Amino acid sequence: LGQVYPGQMDSTFVPVRSHHYDPELTFDFCVNEPAWSNQAGIHSAFGSTDRLYFRKEVPVNHDNDLSSSYSTTVWRGERANAQILVWSSEALEQVRVSTQDLRSAEGNIIPKDRITFELVRYVLSNYPYAEKKAICGESPYKSGFLMPDRFETLDRFDLPSQTTRPVWMMVDVPRGTAPGTYK
């Protein structure tokens, strides 16, 4: 294979697909397999919405972008977005993400039905992450790359062993929401 990049896969295994929403491809490579050795159990963290996290890699805390909590400022009538990462060295079945109403100290509420989650699925790309010279047309890379990109409605999901799964969280703040800090 030569140089291995995060999300890289052997493109000779890629079947010709009829449309974009077919099941994910699953034959990507892990760049840092030893990192999984100290990842027993299930892990989760909020990650940066400006970073891509690869399925076969343990999330790395670059620039303190992984956190156990999420905080943002948002206007009434707007949407706040966050990325939740779930990873495990062991296979897990029926993983669910749930929430509760957000409440202010004054007793105001953002109802939990205004908080939604979508699974981030991986799609085939001609270029590795952060490639500065990506163009439409033929790629100089012989391999394809799986990039986290497509959102899919989330009820629950299975997490294969040594896998990271991003989940996109959206909080739609109602227009009539009273100002305050909601938790």
Predicted regions and their residues:
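Mature N-terminal, pre-catalytic/accessory segment of carbohydrate-active enzymes
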Residues: 1-183
